[in-house]
Amino acid sequence: MAAPGRPSPLAERLRGAWQHRGALALALWPLSLLYGVLTALRRALYRTGLLRSERLPVPVIVVGNVIAGGAGKTPVTLAVVRHLQARGWRPGVISRGYGRATVDCREVLPASSAAEVGDEPLLIARASGAPVFVARRRAQAGRALLAAHPATNILVCDDGLQHLALARDLEVCVFNDEGAGNGWMLPAGPLREPWPRAVDLVLHAGSSPGGGAPQFALSRELATHAVNASGHQLPLEQLQGEPSHALAAIARPHDFFAMLHARGIQPESEEALPDHYDFSSWKRPPDKRLRLICTEKDAVKLWPAHPDALAVPLALRIPPAFFDALDARLASLSSSGH
């Protein structure tokens, strides 16, 4: 069994293989060739018009990635939405709503449950106040959002670089600190599609992944406070030395635990759970002394049953030059008549 707070040995081995062109990656390389052929064929079908992309009547920004696993797309989406709001835009957000139990197209309301709409869309809706819709087909979500909120004049798609059925005007590609890995496609490498490929802007947490698009380095750290379900904030320094249980149901839970350690918090136990984990069957540690510490994404699922759980927000540092470049591209869209 993997140590608490660490990925499973299999996950660690595969993640390691994705960073190097070693024996395991080489063994999987023939499957990557097949995956690459299928990906190229699908793109060709859209490029030739045999499959059609639906264009919505407002500009569409897609924030996504080309690597498997967590790249930090949702915090970037939230940052983009807040920037657009500050610039006078009226943005809406569309998403597939990964991890939800429903399959229909629906609006994400602050009172929605994560089981109905997905944890990331619910977090975005509560944190931004922007209208959010989820659907398997993003274009359907966009149409429904614009019908319900006709004042919306721009859409941000959380994830969806590979969802070619939705036409887009601007693509933001996000990389974590592992970049493009060994440069191979799944399953021999982390890439969902070949890289480099044409995108408008790149945000990267590690070294530059290469490619011709303008690139901007971002950094992540935890905020200096935690918050409970009622909105009460607690300085993190007050949790130093306190008995606690940290948990994270995100793509890279060890990153969250490491950031807690960097803030001087050493939980007595750490629990790594699968991304989009359903907490309905989760059992709280029996030790009543332990304070629950979690991510914002997990809090939207934990708070209904555990309102005392302390969510630690992620502080994302994106250089102003990125937003300047974003604004410039949006201005060019406006001048071209979109």
Curated annotation (Swiss-Prot):
UniProt enzyme class: transferase
Keyword set, alphabetical order: ATP-binding, Kinase, Lipid A biosynthesis, Lipid biosynthesis, Lipid metabolism, Nucleotide-binding, Transferase
Pathway: Glycolipid biosynthesis; lipid IV(A) biosynthesis; lipid IV(A) from (3R)-3-hydroxytetradecanoyl-[acyl-carrier-protein] and UDP-N-acetyl-alpha-D-glucosamine: step 6/6
EC id: 2.7.1.130
UniProt keyword Lipid biosynthesis, yes or no: yes
Residues that span the membrane, as ranges: none
Catalytic activity: a lipid A disaccharide + ATP = a lipid IVA + ADP + H(+)
Any single Pfam family the record assigns to this protein: LpxK
Binding site for ATP: I67, A68, G69, G70, A71, G72, K73, T74
GO cellular component labels: plasma membrane
GO molecular function: ATP binding; tetraacyldisaccharide 4'-kinase activity
Family: Belongs to the LpxK family.
UniProt name for this protein: Tetraacyldisaccharide 4'-kinase
Organism of provenance: Acidovorax ebreus (strain TPSY)
